């Protein structure tokens, strides 16, 4: 059964690309800390390995993005917060 109401299935790689676009937009305008809350499986994909996606973002944007796993999130759900814990973006598939 498809969990989406509109019947569309979005590939996980597109969600990661959407995350990067959001991060890029924020980091080009602001200099503060950035926190990405996401499902533990997505967190593992973004943080594991020598050249993880998190490390690639650091090299590309010269700013560390802290990635926090949230068990209560759906698989492709994520939220982006600034240093003041203000929610910048919320996405749920």
What is each residue range found by the language model?
Residues 71, 77-93:
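C-terminal intrinsically disordered, low-complexity extensions immediately downstream
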Residues 1-58, 63-75:
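Conserved glycine-centered short motifs in functionally critical loops
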